[in-house]
Amino acid sequence: VSNEQTSPVDPQAEVAPQVASHSLKHAVILGSIGFVAACLSSLAVGAMGEVFTLPPEIVQLGVGAVPGGDTQKIIVAASIAVFYRNSALWLATTGIIVGGLFGFVGGHGNNKSRIVRTVCAVIAGAAFGAAAGIHAVYYGEKCLELLKTGPLSVPESMVMQLHGTTWLIFGLGIGLGSALGSSQRRSAINKIAQGMLLGGIAAAVGGVLYPFVAGIAIPLIDPSIPIPLESNNRLLWMSLPCAILGLALGRRS
């Protein structure tokens, strides 16, 4: 009779690799969904164009206006106000698309929890997206004010802050929406905090990386524009944060 004893198998040791593999697979799926959402968002924003425009009476004021005069200041102020509204609408639309896709595909649970999660992600994405759009224009105004003082271009650190903070706000909303729809309510507060923190940081990383990647991929563009209007530039600006955001939220799930 053999005296050898077989060591007991640790169930956790067998499950851990499977969990890690599933988590990685889910991260890749959500990262891909993030890229698709960015493509759809860029197309939607391009199709929408400038929904809000200058009133005809303001446009008429610009005919023959003296540069630097009071009339010119009124036109500039009105143009900025229009850009605020368009930017809020553009990123709110982006938040709806990204939040909706992440909410529908991400996470677990039955059909009811999937619907709840999607609705929460759409609402939070729209609200925080609009806030991100407003912030982008506000910070963009700071960049313009800096250029008036003498520098020929906006410092890289300021450009990184512009896009990083804009996407930070956006990511907070997507992370919040994903956590609000969770079917597990015992640790709801922790899940919300983790979701917002992870979403905000992940999207901010994509925003910070954008100027560097854009400088290589599209070297002739101006990275200090708050919300890029050129299609390829806008797609790059949206896809980096959304893809990284998807990877992060998918890994957490």
Question: Whereabouts are the PLM-identified features?
Answer:
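Juxtamembrane/disordered regions of integral membrane proteins
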Residues: 2-253
